[in-house]
Amino acid sequence: MLGGSGRVIMVSGASRGLGLAIAKRLHEAGFTVAAGARNPAAVAVKDRLSADRYDAEEAGSAEAWVEAVATRYGRIDGLVNCAGINPKVRVMDAGEESLDQMWRINVKGPLRVTRAAIPHLVKSGKGRVINVASLAGRRVGSNVGYAMTKFAIVALTHGIRQELWDSGVRATALCPGYIATDMTAGETEVSREDMTQPEDLAEMVETLLCLPNNLSVAELLVNCRKESML
């Protein structure tokens, strides 16, 4: 197993929710964490934990963030693409504004960060990319727009694995169900107590980052309740 000492991991969406829980967990485990957030001032900066502005909707934001992290630390060993949104978009809904925004943030954002970081991940020899997808990326519920973006991020993850495997880069699509964060605050189908806790999921992310090159997980499906597909 790989450890955290000396390894630099970028985490997007790190100012709240799951991204914040992941950043905290990795920092506690000895990783150097580079947090990316629209409001970096919301991140409590400390030794081995920096914060930079990153907006997944802005085309140049990914490159600027990666450059800042690489300049600061001299290396990048992994990415956790966690930034995302989930407005309701049904098949018959008029207008495409919300759908387009989800594609920019949930799909193009992770793609841009990964592209910018690839030279550093390859140089690491043990580069890691963890894309936070969803069980909505494995089966479709009422929010078809969200599911479309999460199916796409699973596809992106497999594309990264295929193209960069021989360079030592490993990628995992993490597919959780309901997580007890502000994104699910309005959900009534599952109680908050029954939802997966972000701190528990963050521990799984740490484990994925510590797996050696010859022990790679392509997809990790995580459910908090009985699912027809699991």
Spans of features found by a protein language model:
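Conserved NAD(P)H cofactor-binding loop of Rossmann-fold oxidoreductase domains
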Residues: 82-87
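C-terminal helical subdomain
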Residues: 166-169, 173-174, 190-230
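Active-site helix of classical SDR
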Residues: 114, 149
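Conserved glycine-rich cofactor-binding loop
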Residues: 15-16
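Substrate-binding pocket helix/loop in short-chain dehydrogenase/reductase
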Residues: 90-91, 98-103
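Conserved glycine-rich Rossmann-like NAD(P)H-binding loop of the short-chain dehydrogenase/reductase
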Residues: 29-45
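Residue(s) in the substrate-gating loop at a strand-loop-helix junction
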Residues: 134
